[in-house]
UniProtKB/Swiss-Prot annotation:
Catalytic activity: dodecanoate + reduced [NADPH--hemoprotein reductase] + O2 = 7-hydroxydodecanoate + oxidized [NADPH--hemoprotein reductase] + H2O + H(+)
Source taxonomy: Eukaryota, Viridiplantae, Streptophyta, Embryophyta, Tracheophyta
Membrane topology qualifier: Single-pass membrane protein
Alphabetical GO biological process terms: anther development; lipid hydroxylation; medium-chain fatty acid biosynthetic process; medium-chain fatty acid metabolic process; pollen development; pollen exine formation; pollen wall assembly; sporopollenin biosynthetic process
Organism (species): Arabidopsis thaliana
Protein's recorded name: Cytochrome P450 703A2
Family indicated by similarity: Belongs to the cytochrome P450 family.
EC number: 1.14.14.130
CDD domains cross-referenced by the UniProt entry: CYP71_clan
Transmembrane segment boundaries: 2-22
Subcellular localization: Membrane
Length: 510
């Protein structure tokens, strides 16, 4: 029996090796992009370290704007070149707009049933249409203006209270709570932090922790996605951790949906103050069903919470860190705020379009510290060519936005935080926080997969920064490091701690 099993296993291995040899031979007949030498079976996996975005940028420096890699049994390309990125995301959007079905996406995005991680197809189109037509419309977002203003007030009161101790404030914690509250009030109709919270501090911190954990797992380069046999051993317990987070997140989502259904039964006339979950529960399902499936609602809830919370908080923390490191930048931000807003009132959302220097600060933050170092990887649905090179079907695409912002061919002094480089040439007009026609920064992707929540994300980032710099002077108790941690987002390795000193009249903080 053992001999038979061993023989079958040997035949299986030989078939796999033969298939890979035939595929490699077919690819060699075409001209693949240049890239580093590859090891048998592993390919280039060993060349990816703890900060793979920096590793891949180094490969682009060595081999050119488009680099081919073999990651285990997966073809992959990477680029940090604006023209190549434009080719992938716009000109060949129909080829590259799908997503790879990673184990993290299967476990943590309801079988890739969401918007962000779903492969291209009818399901993705339907889910994105729901977001764009029912959740992220201008009218719907404007209906939450009052709630966002309240959260901005709570943010300042929280920091003011902490500042009275004279001790450094953990800005990662403060900014995370601000982002979380903004999102959960729109999405779920309740706060998790602050005076209006109806949940215990322990539950709130657990929710924030599990959200960060989920986002980290979604971004991790898991060997089981590239070497199927790795899943049999899973020595680091990564897939086990995914299943654990999957279970805990699903329990939370089930509780949220049940709460909303009970509330609807108790108040059948509710129609004015509808949060996103209320809207989703009111929509018809597919194929004539009366309502959307719970799993679809959960997938959309997860997308909104994870994406909007983590990316905004990470961007704000980096912007604060860079501005506090450079008092010159902070002074220019505050001069603009004093000119536009004055010192007798707080910043409103209507002021944000007039804060061009602050918008330059955010653009420069996106250049140096993009929230997503690889965006979300794309996958080709069929074979194609880029820059004259053959790209096989099902090639994984890593668009290196971190490398893009530090590409010395398009930026000078790449390690210097200099917001002035984004100032309009004409000296007037609003500074746009998007990729623009030159594709020199890419905060929200482009093409079919462009982030549908970009306008909301920009508003949340600008409002937090405007309020914090308008209301307080900031200083650091020591040196501020700029070491990052890799994941789907790219936070600081050490939370930012800074000392706040109020700069406005005391009555404005109450």
């Amino acid at each position: 029996m053992i001999l038979v099993l061993a023989s079958l296993f040997a035949v299986l291995i030989l078939n796999v090796l033969l298939w890979r040899w035939l595929k490699a031979s077919a690819c060699k007949a075409q001209r693949l992009p240049p890239g580093p030498p590859r090891l048998p079976i592993l390919g280039n996996l060993l060349q990816l370290g703890p900060l793979p975005h920096r590793d891949l940028a180094s490969l682009c420096d060595k081999y050119g704007p488009l680099v081919y890699l073999r990651l285990g049994n997966v073809d992959a390309i990477t680029t940090n070149d604006p023209d190549t990125i434009r080719e992938i995301l716009l000109r060949q959007d129909d080829v590259f707009s799908s997503r790879p079905k990673t184990l993290a996406a299967v476990h943590l995005a309801y079988g890739c049933g969401d918007v962000a991680l779903a492969p291209m197809g009818p399901h993705w189109k339907r889910m994105r249409r729901i977001c764009m037509e029912h959740l992220l419309t201008t009218k719907r977002l404007e209906s939450f203006t009052t709630q966002r203003a309240e959260e901005a007030r709570y943010l300042i009161r929280d920091v003011f209270k902490r500042s009275e101790t004279g001790k450094p404030i953990n800005l990662k914690e403060v900014l995370g709570a601000f982002s979380m509250n903004n999102v959960t009030r729109m999405l779920l109709g309740k706060q998790f932090f602050g005076p209006g919270s109806l949940v215990s501090p322990k539950e709130a911190q657990e929710f924030l922790h599990i959200t960060h954990k989920l986002f980290w797992l979604l971004g991790v380069i898991y060997l089981g996605d590239y070497l199927p046999f790795w899943r049999w051993v899973d020595p680091s317990g990564c897939e086990k951790e995914m299943r654990d987070v999957e279970k805990r997140v699903d329990e939370f989502h089930t509780k949220i949906i049940d709460e909303h259904r009970r509330a609807k039964l108790e108040d059948e006339d509710k129609n004015g103050d509808m949060d996103f979950v209320d809207v989703l529960l009111s929509l018809p399902g597919e194929n004539g069903k009366a309502h959307m499936e719970d799993v679809e609602i959960k997938a959309l809830i997860q997308d909104m919470i994870a994406a909007a919370t983590d990316t905004s908080a990470v961007t704000n923390e980096w912007a604060m860190a860079e501005a506090i490191k450079q008092p010159r930048v902070m002074r220019k931000i505050q001069e603009e705020l004093d000119n536009v807003v004055g010192s007798n009132r707080m910043v409103d959302e209507s002021d944000l379009v007039h804060l061009n220097y602050l918008r330059c600060v955010v653009r420069e933050t996106f250049r140096m510290h993009p929230a997503g170092p690889f965006l979300i990887p794309h996958e080709s649905v069929r074979a194609t060519t880029i820059n004259g090179y053959y790209i096989p079907a099902k090639t994984r695409v890593f668009i290196n936005t971190h490398g893009l912002g530090r590409n010395t061919k398009i930026w000078d002094d790449v390690e210097d935080f200099r917001p002035e480089r984004h100032w309009p040439v004409e000296g007037s007009g609003r500074v746009e926080i998007s990729h623009g026609p030159d594709f020199k920064i890419l905060p929200f992707s482009a093409g079919k997969r462009k982030c549908p929540g970009a306008p909301l994300g920009v508003t949340m980032v600008l409002m937090a920064l405007a309020r914090l710099f308008h209301c307080f002077e900031w200083s650091s108790p020591g040196n501020i490091d700029t070491v990052e941690v890799y994941g789907m987002t790219m936070p600081k390795a050490k939370p930012l701690r800074a000392i706040a000193k109020p700069r406005l009249a005391a009555h404005l903080y109450t």
